[in-house]
Amino acid sequence: MSFISRSTTTFRRSISMKDYARVRWYSNSGKSLIENILSSKIAISKVYTLKKRIGLPESYPMKVLVQALIDKTVVQNPQYSNEKLWSIGKVFGDFYVLEYIKCKYPRLPEEAVHGMQNGWMGSKALSQLATIWGLEVQRREEGLQESFGKVLAKRADPEMLRKPGEIYKDEAARRAILAILGGVYLHQGFNDTKKFINDHILSKQLDPRTMLQLQWPRRQLSRLCKRLSLKEPVYRIIAETGRKSREPVFVIGAYSGHHLLGQGQASSLNLAEQQAAYNSLISYYIHSPPFRQLPSDYLEVNDGKIPKASEPYTSIPLVSHGQLVI
């Protein structure tokens, strides 16, 4: 987030203190920090409550969950922080979410794909998920006993610029969630990792239409038809009423040859044509072919062996460039 490094005083003062979270180096080692948490009844009860709240199985080690809540900049030794867990969780999270988007919306432009991926795996999205889980960032005035069960990070003064060794609230929450995800993969396996992502991350509803930049729909539809070797789109009136009244309604269809690409309804011919072109583009780009299995379903490994699938893998059906499915 490069904008945080701006030095304008007005900009720095306009951001609330709660939007920052800075990590300080703890004097005690990471090992003793984890041992203190595991040996405290208050601490272990809070961590266990979090474990049950997010649906982790009993076989998920408490030590790993505690370690996932200690950010990598809190302790110098990565063996006792969530640095390695976070790295593993990020790799599998990005891989599976990107695979899901590519299979569900194969025609979606790359900008929209990155937008949806950020909507599920970005700092803001995972920070909201942390709020749903009940995760909090440790406050500056809290002691170690009160911080058990929270992400170990402290708020920073908004007048201070970001320095090495500092992170912010959203990033701290994101690292903690991805570290928990990495622990799921290490101790539960690939199948449970995918289930965890489906239950907690992909369960958030995202509309792919909001990711598309369609500022000039008629021009963009014309270029799309040319790229797909289709006839130039023509706009025809399908129905109308009240042309000479105060509230006319026009229904316009966008045609490529004899094929209806889409239709729009508005109070003027120009707006109706724009809406018809927009709906045609939306229908093309968010086309979602049905599929039963993802390619990663055939990467499941049990005891070092890849089991035979119950049915042969069929690739995601893609429509050829000469067709338009509306």
UniProtKB/Swiss-Prot annotation:
GO terms for molecular function: double-stranded RNA binding; ribonuclease III activity; structural constituent of ribosome. Residues 216-286 form the DRBM domain. One of its GO terms (biological process) is mitochondrial translation. GO terms for cellular component: cytoplasm; mitochondrial large ribosomal subunit; mitochondrion. Keywords: Mitochondrion, Ribonucleoprotein, Ribosomal protein, RNA-binding, Transit peptide. The keyword Ribonucleoprotein applies. It is found in: Mitochondrion. The keyword Ribonucleoprotein applies. InterPro entries: dsRBD_dom (IPR014720), Ribosomal_mL44_DSRM_fung (IPR044443), RNase_III_dom (IPR000999), RNase_III_sf (IPR036389). It comes from the Eukaryota. Residues 47-189 form the RNase III domain. Residues 1-26 form a transit peptide. Its main location: mitochondrion. Component of the mitochondrial large ribosomal subunit (mt-LSU). Mature yeast 74S mitochondrial ribosomes consist of a small (37S) and a large (54S) subunit. The 37S small subunit contains a 15S ribosomal RNA (15S mt-rRNA) and at least 32 different proteins. The 54S large subunit contains a 21S rRNA (21S mt-rRNA) and at least 45 different proteins. mL44 forms a heterodimer with mL57 and stabilizes rRNA expansion segments 1/2 at a membrane-facing protuberance close to the point of attachment of the ribosome to the translocon in the membrane. Component of the mitochondrial ribosome (mitoribosome), a dedicated translation machinery responsible for the synthesis of mitochondrial genome-encoded proteins, including at least some of the essential transmembrane subunits of the mitochondrial respiratory chain. The mitoribosomes are attached to the mitochondrial inner membrane and translation products are cotranslationally integrated into the membrane. Belongs to the ribonuclease III family. Mitochondrion-specific ribosomal protein mL44 subfamily. This is Large ribosomal subunit protein mL44. It comes from Schizosaccharomyces pombe (strain 972 / ATCC 24843) (Fission yeast). The lineage of its organism: Eukaryota, Fungi, Dikarya, Ascomycota, Taphrinomycotina.
